[in-house]
């Protein structure tokens, strides 16, 4: 009997090590990918905001104490040529509209389309049809292998690290460093906090009505400046951004004005609503068990395999009193091996239910109006 137990322990030990390798080398690349068919909506809100508004038929004016909402819709462009089952690139489009709630006036809007590496979440090129548009009819498109919106745009990579990343700022139109700032708990999830501050930065020169900045002239030359402090809470295993807070100031300065002396055309804080944060957290909680199997479990399997092999070797040199411990280890090994086998065989790609044969182009995403 001892010989049978020894052989079984050695076999299970080898199986556990092999299963760990399968999870790490096969199942991880299969599951740890951004989905093609994303379709989400989130809302950010701000109270007491100062902003320039554009009344219908009137002239732009500065209003204070506004309640502002920013609605963002993200969906996958399944008709894009880059989309392939189990491929490494996906294509997402994002539409955002910012409104002042009392009069339902639109303050700003944008539409973006971008190709993403499904593992790192970074923008990639070439990307057929990549663009951004912040004014209707004035679309900026990528040419050739140009990377129009580099860096991270929507998410962080799987297994996010405690280090700096490059986050694309849609106002600056370029990526900026965002810094790891600590850990905290959010709705039962351990998250990483990333923060950066963009100092007041000149964006463009404009000619605006003098009345907008309290001047008697019919028009005045000004420069628009932008500053933001952005805080993102990221679930590190999935790279999902669960919460966003942005303290934003944009002001118009004349040639003689310094920092803080200009006219604020947007000043306030926008943060993701509790409902949106909860929806993000619930989605992560649904996916974490799958990813646990392919991140933590391989290490446990390697350790278990080594222990089982060690027990088997020890039993080769022990008498019958070692058989009880060996039998218990064997039973534990069989149970765990069965669990692992079930998990590996039932792991499915996020593309397994995706139908790419009858998709219709979704180019109608329009300024978040869904």
Model-based region annotation:
Residues 2-8, 290-347:
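Juxtamembrane interface at the cytosolic side of transmembrane helices
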Residues 2-134, 341-350:
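Solvent-exposed N-terminal domain segments of exported/luminal and surface proteins
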Residues 7-10, 14, 145, 182, ...:
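N-terminal hydrophobic or amphipathic segments with adjacent small-residue motifs
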Residues 122-177:
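A surface/extracellular/periplasmic glyco- and lipid-processing/surface-interacting theme
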Residues 127-142, 190-196, 201, 260:
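N-terminal short leaders/motifs
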Residues 153-255:
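Membrane-proximal low-complexity regions enriched in glycine and acidic/polar residues
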Residues 214-315:
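Membrane-proximal extracellular "stem/stalk" segments
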Residues 278-279, 350-370:
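N-terminal low-complexity, Pro/Thr-rich disordered segments
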């Amino acid at each position: 009997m001892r010989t049978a137990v020894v052989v079984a322990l050695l076999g299970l030990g080898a199986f556990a090590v092999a299963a760990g390798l399968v999870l790490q080398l096969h199942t991880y690349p299969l599951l740890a990918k951004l989905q093609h068919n994303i379709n989400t909506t989130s809302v950010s809100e701000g109270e007491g905001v100062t902003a320039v508004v554009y009344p219908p038929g009137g002239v732009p004016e500065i209003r204070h104490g506004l309640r502002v909402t920013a609605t963002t819709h993200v969906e996958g462009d399944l008709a894009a040529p880059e989309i392939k089952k189990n491929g490494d690139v996906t294509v997402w489009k994002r539409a955002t509209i910012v409104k002042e709630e009392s009069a339902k006036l639109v303050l700003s809007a944008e539409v973006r389309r971008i190709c993403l590496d499904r593992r790192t979440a970074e923008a990639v090129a070439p990307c057929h049809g990549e663009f951004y548009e912040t004014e209707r009819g004035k679309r900026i498109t990528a040419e050739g292998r140009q990377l129009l919106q580099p860096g991270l745009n929507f998410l962080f990579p799987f297994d996010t690290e405690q280090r700096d990343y490059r986050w694309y700022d849609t106002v600056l139109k370029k990526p900026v460093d965002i810094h790891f700032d600590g850990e905290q708990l959010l709705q039962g999830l351990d998250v990483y906090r990333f923060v950066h501050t963009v100092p007041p930065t000149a964006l463009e020169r404009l000619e605006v009505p003098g009345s907008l900045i309290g001047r008697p002239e019919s028009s005045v030359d000004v420069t628009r400046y932008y500053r933001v402090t952005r805080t993102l809470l990221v679930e590190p295993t999935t790279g999902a951004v669960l919460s966003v807070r942005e303290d934003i100031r944009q002001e118009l300065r004349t040639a003689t004005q310094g920092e803080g002396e200009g006219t604020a055309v947007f000043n306030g804080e926008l943060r993701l609503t509790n409902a949106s944060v909860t929806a993000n957290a619930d989605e992560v909680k649904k996916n974490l068990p799958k990813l646990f199997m392919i991140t933590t479990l391989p290490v446990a399997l390697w350790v278990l395999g080594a222990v089982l092999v060690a027990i088997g070797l020890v039993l080769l040199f022990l008498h019958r009193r070692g058989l009880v411990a060996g039998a218990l280890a064997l039973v534990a090994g069989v149970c765990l091996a069965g669990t692992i086998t079930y998990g590996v065989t039932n792991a499915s790609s996020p593309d397994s239910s995706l139908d790419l044969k009858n998709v219709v182009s979704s180019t109608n995403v329009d300024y978040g109006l869904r």
